[in-house]
Amino acid sequence: MKKALVIRFLAGIYYIQDLDNQTILKAQKKGVLKKSNFIQDNQLKNNRDKMSIKVGDIVLYGMCYDKYLIYAILPRKNELKRPNIANIDQVLLVFSLVKPHFQTLLLDKFLLILQQHKLDVILVFSKIDLIEKEELEEIQQNMNYYFPFYTCYYVDSKQQIGIGVLKNIFEQKITVLAGQTGVGKSTLLKALIPDANLKTQEISESLGRGKHTTKNAQLYLFNNGFIADTPGFSKLDLGGFSYQNLKNFYPDFLKYVDNCYFGTNCLHLQETQCGVKEALTQGKIIPSRYSNYCYFMEEIKKEKKIYVKN
């Protein structure tokens, strides 16, 4: 059997790219697949865990009569459910500065979820041509706060502004384009790969959100790597976080924990001696970052019906 990368799934057909000769083939799944591992003698060993194929999977395939069949999925280094994709190297998180307007609340929620999956994140802000210069400079100044942890790019995909500097980050990686519907992911992909078969989304004036054109994740070969276009996000769930552990996903908070009376047990909310709140008052933490944290803590408390003594 040979190895291939799953680059697309459509109507029961998997489009796979052979890892040796780069040929793109159409294949079908052979019965119920099981998670596979290679052992020392290079023989295939199956366990009982049933698996569904995701875009980004490395699979074993072979010819059966007149068609190609996928027999097994090799171990994944990571995976997401929304979007449904595996073996991600980095996430290009795209935000629109207008239509829909940029919100730090949405940014921080995305960052939490992606950090929970231990994924490297690069921030891209689109539609810079539709915003006033002064407003753009203000946003850039606020985003400098995130710069020690995340690289930021500002682009106008239609005019190719800022696109050139992006091209080198894709080499030898599977990069996922992620973001809210209508932020310009498909337009950005079109700017990077002009022959990508995409339709630019129209923005619904009545709802202020984009209409779906990307139905399923798909990998596009680019600069010796792959870019994954994914469906837009309409809902982000914090169900994987707890009231106690959310703070651990704020790298900018961690350096102030030593100044908290309760140390790593401090929730940075109502405690009287809190290094994070002290850093906030000193301007070392931007107000939106902390207020979003409090909002998420309240969201988790309501969702999990946690009762906190005042």
UniProtKB/Swiss-Prot annotation:
HAMAP family: GTPase_RsgA. Residues 77-236 form the CP-type G domain. It is found in: Cytoplasm. Binds 1 zinc ion per subunit. InterPro entries: G_CP_dom, P-loop_NTPase, Ribosome_biogen_GTPase_RsgA, RsgA_GTPase_dom. Belongs to the TRAFAC class YlqF/YawG GTPase family. RsgA subfamily. Its EC number is 3.6.1.-. Keywords: Cytoplasm, GTP-binding, Hydrolase, Metal-binding, Nucleotide-binding, Ribosome biogenesis, RNA-binding, rRNA-binding, Zinc. This is Small ribosomal subunit biogenesis GTPase RsgA. SUPFAM superfamilies: P-loop containing nucleoside triphosphate hydrolases. It is an enzyme of class 3 (hydrolase). One of several proteins that assist in the late maturation steps of the functional core of the 30S ribosomal subunit. Helps release RbfA from mature subunits. May play a role in the assembly of ribosomal proteins into the subunit. Circularly permuted GTPase that catalyzes slow GTP hydrolysis, GTPase activity is stimulated by the 30S ribosomal subunit. It holds the Pfam family RsgA_GTPase. It comes from Phytoplasma australiense. One of its GO terms (cellular component) is cytoplasm. The gene is rsgA. GO terms for biological process: ribosomal small subunit biogenesis. GO terms for molecular function: GTP binding; GTPase activity; metal ion binding; rRNA binding.
